[in-house]
Amino acid sequence: MSVISMKQLLEAGVHFGHQTRRWNPKMAPYIFTERNGIYIIDLQQTVEKLEQAYEFVKKLAMEGGTILFVGTKKQAQDSIKEEAERCGMFYVNQRWLGGTLTNFKTIRGRIQRLKELKKMEEDGTFDVLPKKEVIKLRKEKERLQKFLGGIENMESLPSALFIVDPKKEAIAVAEARSLEIPIVAIVDTNCDPELIDYPIPGNDDAIRAVKLITSKIADAVIEGNQGEQFAASEE
């Protein structure tokens, strides 16, 4: 039983690539044809590549690994958050803060600050502070929550990244590569698939297409976690 059907991919518009003038020649092997100035992605390869990515993610989760879901473009923000939360993983869906991986210690410091501010709000500290001070602290907390909320409980570097549009998330790609963290990504016809360990050729601009593929990666995590629990109960 394959992870995904051609019918599902077609219905979600995964086959629509970018305009022919906006392409990366390295994507040529994944292009089926050109229609009305738009490249059409070869969905048979999408099925195959998604299966490879699924197996990788499932195995990783089974071994207790973590995945960081990354997608900051409008079309990806909701899916990235929803699917990462559904499978109990971490996410970045606002802005990728430079150094999120390569300067993780500093980022952990900012997360610590976020936790402190939340505690102050909960334990009544805000009630005894001057109003002006509280407004300032609340603003700081909201900003930190916006950018770091999805990685608040990420205690160590992730085992892998799942990225929607690695061209847009070039900094995340560069950081992961420098730390040799494997990358799974949806690669559209304007991306460089050679930078990605598990490229999944597909439309990264349609909400439905992004949701479909992201949900499959989350399913792989869930299936892997069930395997991990099963293995633990067998011991």
UniProtKB/Swiss-Prot annotation:
Annotated Gene3D superfamilies: Glucose-6-phosphate isomerase like protein, domain 1, Helix hairpin bin
GO cellular component, one term: cytosolic small ribosomal subunit
GO biological process assignments: translation
GO molecular function: structural constituent of ribosome
CDD domains assigned: RPS2
Recorded superkingdom: Bacteria
Alphabetical UniProt keywords: Ribonucleoprotein, Ribosomal protein
InterPro entries in alphabetical order: Ribosomal_uS2, Ribosomal_uS2_bac/mit/plastid, Ribosomal_uS2_CS, Ribosomal_uS2_flav_dom_sf
Cross-referenced PROSITE patterns: RIBOSOMAL_S2_1
Pfam families: Ribosomal_S2
Family: Belongs to the universal ribosomal protein uS2 family.
PANTHER family: 30S RIBOSOMAL PROTEIN S2 PROKARYOTIC AND ORGANELLAR, SMALL RIBOSOMAL SUBUNIT PROTEIN US2M
Protein name (record): Small ribosomal subunit protein uS2
Origin species: Thermoanaerobacter pseudethanolicus (strain ATCC 33223 / 39E)
Gene encoding the protein: rpsB
